[in-house]
Structure formats: C-alpha cells, structure tokens
C-alpha cells in the first residue's frame, strides 16, 4: 500500500 504507516482513509478505507 501507499505509505503503509500513513493509513490514509481516503486512499485505503479498508486500512482505517
């Protein structure tokens, strides 16, 4: 994923 630690809800809602 992009950033990984970033956990951007906008790009990765599944990570949030």
Curated annotation (Swiss-Prot):
User: Which Enzyme Commission number(s) are on file for it?
Assistant: 3.4.21.-
Annotated localization: Secreted
Q: Tell me, what is an example of a GO biological process annotation in this record?
A: proteolysis
Say where the protein is mainly found: secreted
Keyword annotations? Disulfide bond, Hemostasis impairing toxin, Hydrolase, Protease, Secreted, Serine protease, Toxin
Report the domain of life of the source organism.
Answer: Eukaryota
Keyword hit for Methyltransferase: no
Could you give one GO CC term from the UniProt record? extracellular region
Q: Which GO terms describe its molecular function?
A: serine-type peptidase activity; toxin activity
How would you summarize where this protein is expressed among tissues?
Expressed by the venom gland.
Role: Snake venom serine protease that may act in the hemostasis system of the prey.
Q: Which family does it belong to?
A: Belongs to the peptidase S1 family. Snake venom subfamily.
For this entry, the protein name equals Vipera russelli proteinase RVV-V homolog 1
Organism, by scientific name, is: Daboia russelii (Russel's viper)
